[in-house]
Amino acid sequence: MDPVIVVGAGPVGLALSLALAGAGVPTVVLDEGPGKDDPRPARSVVLHADTAAMAHRLGCTTLRDEGAHFAAWRTSRRGRDSRRITFEDHPAPLHLPQHALTRGLRDAAGAHPLVRLVTDCRLDALEQDERGVTAHTRGGETTWWRGSHLVGCDGARSTVRKLLGIRFPGRTSVERHAVAALRTELPWPGEALLHRGAHHEVTARPLPDGVWRLDWLLPSRGELVTPDALVTLIRDTLAAWCGGTTPPYDLIDTGVHTLHHRLARRWRDGRAYLAGDAAHLLGALGTQGVEEGLRDAENLAWKLALDWHQGASEALLDSYEAERRTAVAARLRAADQAMPGLRGGNGLRTYLPGAARSAEDRLTDGHLGRGQLGAEPSYAPPVAVREVPTATEPGGPVADVPVTAPDGTTVPLRDLLGRGRLLVLLVAPGTGVWDRRHWFGAGLMPRLAAAVSALPTRADLLVADSYPGAPAHTVLLVRPDGHLAATFAGVRPAELYEAADAVRGGAPGPARAPSVTPAVTTPTSVID
C-alpha cells in the first residue's frame, strides 16, 4: 500500500510521520525548506504532560538538554507577588525553543526506516480518487507522489488547505507581543513569572543555561517596535525586578509576534486532512498552538494507521475533525469570552479583589495547561460505557499509572500509547509485588486474555496495581491516544467487544468520495 504523504516538516508534520511510523505506516514528508531551521530562542513552545510525553515517546532527544521545566509559577501585580504555584503533585510545564523541538523530531524521523524526508520541494497540485491521493511538487524534486492519504501540516498559509478550497475564517491581530531571549540572572532562578501592572503585562519563562524568554503584551494594532524601544523595555523591566538596577544581560534574539485566531471550516476532504496551523491558529492568553497541533497528530495517527492496515469506517475517519475541531473551537471560544475582561481595559472592575483573582486564574490556566484555556481535552465516546466509576470520565485522558506491559516490564502507561493499538487495563492489587509468572495465568487473566485476543482490532493487555478511583478487578478500555473509552466490572467479553467496535467506528465501509477531485496545477491557485 502507498505511504501517507505529509506536507510540511514542522513539529506537527514530523510528529505525525513518527506517530504513523510507530504504528507501522510508512510516510513521505514533503518539506518546502532545506531541512534545517535557524536557531531562534525567542520563538519557543511550552509542552505539558501529555505532549511532552508524546514527544519523548517519538524519540525527540532535545527535550532534556534544550528544555527547562518550570521550577514554579509566580504571578505578581504592581510589583508585589500574589501567588506561587509549585509542581510537586503533577509534572511541570516544559519550555524549549521551537527549533530545538523541530530538530529533535527531525533527527528521529531521519533515523526511522519508515519515514522519508524530501526537502526543497513545494506542493502545487493534488488530486484524489477512491484509493488514494496524488500530489505534484516542484523544486528539488519535481514529480508526482502517490499516497494512501495526504495530511497538510504546512502552516498558516497552507497550500493544501487552499488547493482543497477550504475556508479559514477568524480574527486577526488578537494579541501582539514584543519578545526577547536574553541571558541574565533574575531573583527567582528557574521560575516562570506573569507580572501585571496598571498598563502592562510581562511574562518571563526560563530556558537552560540562564536564558529567559520575556514577552511584553503590546496594543494589538500599535506602532512598530523599534530596537531602541525594545532595549528600553528590557532595561526598565529588569530594573523593576532587580531592585531598581538593570543587571548585566546578553541579548540573544528578539521579535514581535502577532497572534491570530482562525479555524478551518473543514479538516477532512476525502483522503486529505489538515492538522496544526493549517487547521487552526491560536495563542492568546497563553494557549499553545504547537501543542494543539501535536494533539492533532496523535488523534489522527491511530485512525489513519487503522485505515492503512485493515480499513476504517467513515465514522472513525470523520471523528478526527469532530473531536479535534470541537476541542480547538472550545479553546478559541474560551479565549474570546475571556478577552474583554482581561484585555478590554474596563477600568475599576478589573482591579477589584475578586475580579483580579479571576483574571489571574484565567491567565494562569493557559500557561499551566489547566481549565478551558489549557487542559488536555476530553472526547465524547461513541458509546459511554461506565460500569465502574473511576477518577477518569469516559473520553478523558487516562492517568499515567505504572503498568505491567505484555513483555513483563513495568512502565508508565503513557509510554505504551501511540502504537495504533487499543489498551485493555486490568486493575489487580498486588500484582506489582508478585512475579508476573505467578499471576499471569491465574484468576481473571486467562479469560481476559482470550477476550482481548478476540477484539475486532489489535489490542494489548496491561495490568496495574491500582488506578485512581477504580476498585479491584476493574477493566479499562483505552484508545491508542490515551483517552478512556469504557470501564467494566470484571471480564465482560461481549461488552468489551462492543466497546472496542464502537471505538473503531464499526466495520469498514465504502470510502466517501472527496468533495474536490480535480488536480490544481496553476501557481495562482495557491496565492492569497
Give residue ranges: language-model regions.
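Active-site-adjacent segment of FAD-dependent monooxygenases/related oxidoreductases
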Residues: 39-110, 332
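Glycine-rich Rossmann-fold phosphate-binding loop(s) that bind the pyrophosphate
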Residues: 9-11, 32
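A conserved short coil-to-beta-strand element within the FAD-binding core of flavoproteins
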Residues: 119-133
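Glycine-rich FAD pyrophosphate-binding loop
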Residues: 21-43
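Conserved mid-domain beta->alpha element of the FAD-binding
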Residues: 11-19, 152, 251, 257-337, ...
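Core beta-strand elements of the Rossmann-like FAD/NAD(P) dinucleotide-binding domain
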Residues: 140-149
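Conserved FAD-binding catalytic core of PHBH/FMO-like flavoproteins
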Residues: 136, 149, 153-259
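Helical substrate-recognition/capping region of FAD-dependent monooxygenase/halogenase enzymes
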Residues: 2-3, 7, 21-23, 103, ...
